[in-house]
Amino acid sequence: MSTAGEFNIYASSVETMKKQIRVIFQDVEGEISVELDDSHSPKTVQKIIKNLPIEVSIHRWGDELYTEKTQIAEKPENAKIKVNLFDVAYWPEGGALCLFFGPTPISKSGEILAYSPVNIVGKIIGHSTEEENFLNKISDGARVVFK
């Protein structure tokens, strides 16, 4: 028989952690907000938080922005290829952070597909038509800071 205290300890260990961060695009003087959520990839989210701020160049692949290799080194964690609109992910194969705001070159039938399996770590929040248009204006090689 468990006590209420034991139940509370268990309950708190399965709660998800959410943290809002900013992604600042230095070359265009703009930013977006991202909510990190460890419900899918808790180890990956913890490594991202420990490495903040992350200052890197960003590249474009269709309607996905992905960073150059980061200092984050994490294995696939509940990794998947099919992602949702505005998902933020970590790409274990490339050591990069990814922002999905539309189809990639390999997407089909309205699905958004990553190049290879990614760990989902959060969402672009407050996404509006303005932010979608803003992300479309980001050029390959732009400097970005996650903080």
Language-model-detected regions and their locations in the chain:
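Start-of-domain signal
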Residues: S2-E55
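Glycine-rich active-site loops that engage anionic ligands at enzyme catalytic sites
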Residues: V34, D38-K47, N51-K147
